[in-house]
């Protein structure tokens, strides 16, 4: 399967999971903006202090979102296949993130 076909499959999966129906042209336009990331265990998609530039769709793997409080890591959320991941305040306000987005295992995610 080539990258364009993969992007279309992922776009369909996202739309299906949220009950969204798109025309073929709109689905292809959506697929065109999906950016694939193959990442290793421990990789950080977003680090504390970085601005979150994507909403991520988890195609394969596990993603941990956490923050630090009094030098202790506090789990905010764990996401898996089919989930969306975002540091919402950072993404929309364009401010440095207080949340870290890290991979718990080798993963494939698509940035939107």
Tell me the role of every PLM-derived stretch.
Residues 1-112:
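Cytosolic regulatory regions built on CNB/CRP/Popeye-like sensor folds
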């Amino acid at each position: 399967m080539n990258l364009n076909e993969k992007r279309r499959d992922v776009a369909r999966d996202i739309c299906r999971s949220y009950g969204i129906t798109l025309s073929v042209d709109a689905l292809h336009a959506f697929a065109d903006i999906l950016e694939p990331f193959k990442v290793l265990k421990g990789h950080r998609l977003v680090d504390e202090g970085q601005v979150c530039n994507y909403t991520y769709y988890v195609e394969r793997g596990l993603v941990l979102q956490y923050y630090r409080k009094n030098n202790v890591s506090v789990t905010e959320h764990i996401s898996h296949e089919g989930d969306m991941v975002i540091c919402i305040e950072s993404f929309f306000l364009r401010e440095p993130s207080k949340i870290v987005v890290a991979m718990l295992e080798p993963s494939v995610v698509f940035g939107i």
